[in-house]
Amino acid sequence: RVEPAAREGGAGIGAVLVVAGDDLHRQAGGAGGFGGRGGFQAPPARGEDILIDIGGPERLSLHAATIAPESACTSMQLHLQVSPGDFATNWNAAQVIAGPQLALGANSPFFFGHELWSETRIELFTQATDTRPEELKTQGVRPRVWFGERWITSIFDLFEENVRYFPSLLPELSDEDPVAELAAGRTPKLSELRLHNGTIYRWNRPVYDVVGGRPHLRVENRVLPAGPTVLDMLANSAFYYGLLRALADDDRPIWTKLSFAAAERNFRAAAQYGIDARLYWPGYGEVTADELVLRELLPLAHEGLRQWG
């Protein structure tokens, strides 16, 4: 009932509502399969089916043989190309923004016929791609989808975490010798680094890429769902880019006054409760998301957009 009503009003919902039971057991892989090449690897890495267990106004509990449930999640990804020296500042700012950003943009309350979180996509994607069996969870092994655990001082902090915490799911090697490429005056593609990084799903992902022989770094913001309308998506994008600029340019960065754990709690609260979430912010304490946005964050976003020109 929800999908036709939304379509009639010109709005899209951030999670596919027509996933059927057979879809959850479809074999992954190939160009048309759920999850691409990684779909083959997730269940073997676990050694068991994937349990999806999400609370909310209604509770959903089911098992899936592959990571197919994550394919129901639709997102809008926002990219910002930055210099190496500015990467850490912008990534930290994006992490701070994630909670308020999601509170405003939550658009995936339904999945598999159940009303769950305001942005169910966050928890659904987290659980559907979790390759850890229970014993590894209790040992503190990190999940493939995660918010992170600390503020950073360099993009290398994140790439070092990739190597330290996450075994390769797709052990493919290229013939490139990066040192030889540099010595020859060419830009190394670092294919192994990029492939491995692509199997780790941070909500703000570091990206190294090469276009036309020129390397660059990007912050890939993966927080927002798609929809509900093009106008909403443009407004959410403007809020993100404006607030990101304002926080990144602040002489006393907000993350020096906000613990990383508090930023993660904001993110999860926003995923569960959307605009009704209560968020922590320095100088305000715990405050409703709408009050925080209206009193503090919209003016900052406006100033940030002005700085962008």
Model features per residue range: what roles?
Residues 1, 7-10, 21, 26-309:
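Phosphate/nucleotide-binding catalytic core
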Residues 12-18:
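Generic short N-terminal amphipathic or hydrophobic helices
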